[in-house]
Amino acid sequence: MIIEITAYKEKFVEFYNSQDSKIQRKIEYVLDLVRYEKKVPQKFLKALKNTDGIYEVRVITSFRSIRILCFMDGGNLVVLTNCFLKKTQKTPKNQIKLAERLKREYLIDKNS
């Protein structure tokens, strides 16, 4: 089964477009793993505890650790919400709150 991936609002797209082509290729590689692999290794995709169904896509380069927050809409759609450079051990709460808010907005938009 192929997973469809879409970005909601502009946060992910703005971040992606601001990266150089090498980083963009790394992001695309990891998103392709999510899209095509039946079981994505946890080093690339992890459910975040104590959240409203938010997942963290992990893109690791030699100089940066990039996180893309997302959620599932049904069994075959991943919705990307926001993206950031991870600088600490824990995922910043403000980024999680933003992803949860965008998820709520997405569901309202979808159902209206």
Describe each model-derived feature in a short phrase.
Residues T81:
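ATP-dependent carboxylate-activation loops
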Residues M1-S65, G74-V78, K87-S112:
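Basic, Lys/Arg-enriched alpha-helical interface segments
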